[in-house]
Amino acid sequence: MPVASARIRSGKVAATCTDVHRVRPSVPEAPHSGPWRGSVSTMKKLINAVDNVVTDALRGMAAAHPHELDIDLDQHIVYRRRPKEQGKVAIISGGGSGHEPLHGGFVGTGMLDAACAGEIFTSPVPDQVVAATSAVDRGAGVLHIVKNYTGDVMNFEMAAEIVDAESGIQVASVVTNDDVAVEDSLFTAGRRGVGVTVMVEKIAGAAAEQGRPLDEVAGIAARVNAAGRSMGMALTSCTVPANGKPSFDLPEGEMEIGIGIHGEPGRHREKIAPAAEIAERLVTPILAELTALTELDSAGADEGVIAMVNGMGATPLLELYLMYGEIARLLQDAGITVARNLVGNYITSLDMAGCSLTLVRADAELLSLWDAPVNTPGLRWGA
């Protein structure tokens, strides 16, 4: 299967259960000609065929990063091209496609060893997770980082059970659940896992890179999740290629506060306000929760927050920086130090216009792990 100069894995893990959703059907080659199968009247997208969007995107990712990534186009798994030696805890994550660079863009030194890509806004199947877990194990166990969506949690849990029964690989799991907009939704039991997932993958990945044991890496990941909260908003909805129309209707002049990353509408709708007021809508509920958190379980003192202003996919960087400026001002007024920050697209929702804010209370250890070298398509520093 030709993919530029990138090495492509192939083959599947044999199915050992009767769940028909466990095994991914074979994926055809991308067409080079022929009709574009989509609703031309309702959406415009740079795609070939709706059915092949994820495979085509992974093929392009392999061509763009031939020296960093090793991509299995059959299983839709992104692997770190040069894994560390035996004895390193491996970390995998995954979820529906459409949130790029999450998760595949965070595979590499200092973050993930593998990422499982589901179809757009659809959880990866257990067989993908089993294959990735078995492939990346270096004898020290594997950490699964899972966003709190029912399908993701169920399929990763099933995969861990299969791995335990078939190979005995030690697996730990951390479920992210940082979205303050909802306590429950159609997709979750409890809060949704959103922006803090990026922080968990970065900080836990640094701990694993240092050679720390599985229980310690998992404990650090859980600490980051517990210390983080997020809130998002949208100016427009997003369009899933297979649907051909926006996931919800948002009239001109209105915005949604508290949206999800799968095109879920927000918890309330209101007239579009100036950026300063929108920033306040995001900061206020997050700070209400962060100030209620107990002191972090670490030897260091609270060092402030790591702040991420994240674009939802169609928001210009100019506007994201403008929003960060307003948010930084509000945090300063509240007496909160921004120790580190990210501004850009890190966990998106296809072509949605809008942004989200994630704040993580950090201590000296978490900041040190945050600052550790990372070399992935989506995050790079110090490497």
PLM feature spans:
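N-terminal amphipathic/basic leader segments beginning at the initiator methionine
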Residues: W36-I91, A364-L366, W370-A383
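Glycine-rich phosphate/diphosphate-binding loops and the adjacent beta-loop-alpha structural elements
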Residues: K245-L322
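C-terminal non-catalytic interaction/assembly regions of soluble proteins
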Residues: P285, T294-A383
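Short glycine-rich or small-residue beta-strand-to-loop segments that form or flank ligand, phosphate
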Residues: K44, V89-G96, L112-A115, G141-G151, ...
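Glycine-rich oxoanion-binding loops at beta->alpha junctions
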Residues: H99, F106-R138, L287
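Internal, active-site/partner-interface "lid" segment
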Residues: V182-R191, E201-E264
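Intrinsically disordered, low-complexity segments enriched in small polar residues
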Residues: S5, S10-G11
